[in-house]
């Protein structure tokens, strides 16, 4: 998952042609937008969309095509053009399907106009967008993405509920039902506006990378994100083959590949355990748990407590009887109290209930006899 402005592109997309074309200085445009947001109690992203729309009046036709055309002029960081296909190929060679998503407060229409989007680089672009009238002219915000609601899109990606209007994103999904677990996610961003997403990905076991402009070498923001525990890695925003970022992401894909193998293995073992449990009652599971507890008893007091619980249950399985006999032979915390009345009574009944004596039962009989003589 990627932010866009200053993550894939060196500057805000609006500042790379659009703002200038409507006769504004870039800094003055953002100042006007922020003042509107502050004075009106308006979301900052809604404010810039409003100012864009208003300032276009009488100067240009504010259509999707116009915005996409401005998007086609947006400069991208080195290597971005072939990054997405290259990383997809690397993942495929390691058994990992790579999907690229944009989660940006910028304009979807402008992002769609970039070379990367036109080459179908992205699975989905989640960004602010306009609603257009029957003439194709923008009249109202259709969707606004800000730094706090960005996180909903991570949940949509995780659950495979990609439609922004699908309420199933709020449904409970079991871990093995998640389409893309967060442990398999990589989030790349550049600033505090990415922090909620970075935090969410990291908390889910995934990776968050902070990037900075290699031209300016200004690492102030990534240092802060590292200091605040928002990222574990940072690198120059150079997406070229062989770059630091390229190596870092490939190393993460390698780890995801291994993790997927381990998760598949764990899943198979879990299914085996569940098949074993099918048809077994709560009493069956309770009995086995107590037998294991007796095998691992660390004190005489624990032994007496476990035996009291076992006496309440019926022990009919030959395998379970052998496990109990083995516990008395191998665990001193059991063997040394065989002469105690409750333990003696339990093991005597256990042996008497066996149709065919075993080596273990004969050994326990001898120990019981010895303990009786000592008493």
Model regions: which residues?
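Alpha-helical substrate-recognition element adjacent to the catalytic core
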Residues: 1-134, 225, 229-232
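C-terminal cap/substrate-recognition subdomain and adjoining C-terminal extension
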Residues: 78-101, 105-375
């Amino acid at each position: 998952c990627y932010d866009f402005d200053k993550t894939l592109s060196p500057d805000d997309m609006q500042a790379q042609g659009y703002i200038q074309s409507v006769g504004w200085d870039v800094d003055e445009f953002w100042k006007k937008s922020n003042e509107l947001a502050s004075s009106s109690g308006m979301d900052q992203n809604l404010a810039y969309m409003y100012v864009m729309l208003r300032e276009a009046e009488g100067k240009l036709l504010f259509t999707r095509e116009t915005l996409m055309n401005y998007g086609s002029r947006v400069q991208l960081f080195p290597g971005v053009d072939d990054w997405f296909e290259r990383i997809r190929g690397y993942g495929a060679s390691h058994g990992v399907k790579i999907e690229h998503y944009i989660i940006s407060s910028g304009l979807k229409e402008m992002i769609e106009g970039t070379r990367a989007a036109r080459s179908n680089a992205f699975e989905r672009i989640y960004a602010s967008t306009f609603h257009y009238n029957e003439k194709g002219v923008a009249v109202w915000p259709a969707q606004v993405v800000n730094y706090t609601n960005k996180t909903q899109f991570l949940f949509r990606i995780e659950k495979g509920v990609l439609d922004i209007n699908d309420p199933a994103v709020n449904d409970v999904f079991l871990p093995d039902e998640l389409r893309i677990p967060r442990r398999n996610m990589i989030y790349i961003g550049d600033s505090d506006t990415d922090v909620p997403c970075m935090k969410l990905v990291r908390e889910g076991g995934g990776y968050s990378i902070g990037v900075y402009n290699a031209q300016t070498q200004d690492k102030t923001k990534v240092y802060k994100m590292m200091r605040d525990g928002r990222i574990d890695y940072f690198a120059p925003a150079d997406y070229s083959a062989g770059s630091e970022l390229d190596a870092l992401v490939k190393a993460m894909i390698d780890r995801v590949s291994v993790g997927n193998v381990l998760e598949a293995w764990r899943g198979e073992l879990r299914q085996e355990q569940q098949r074993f449990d099918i048809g077994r009652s709560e009493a069956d599971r309770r009995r086995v748990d107590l037998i294991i507890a007796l095998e691992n008893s660390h004190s005489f007091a624990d032994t007496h407590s476990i035996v009291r619980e076992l006496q309440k249950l019926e022990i009919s399985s030959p395998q379970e009887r052998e496990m109990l006999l083995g516990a008395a032979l191998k665990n001193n915390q059991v063997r040394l109290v065989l002469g105690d009345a409750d333990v003696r009574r339990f093991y005597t009944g256990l042996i008497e209930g066996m149709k065919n004596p075993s080596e273990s039962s004969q050994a326990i009989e001898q120990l019981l006899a010895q303990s009786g003589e000592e008493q």
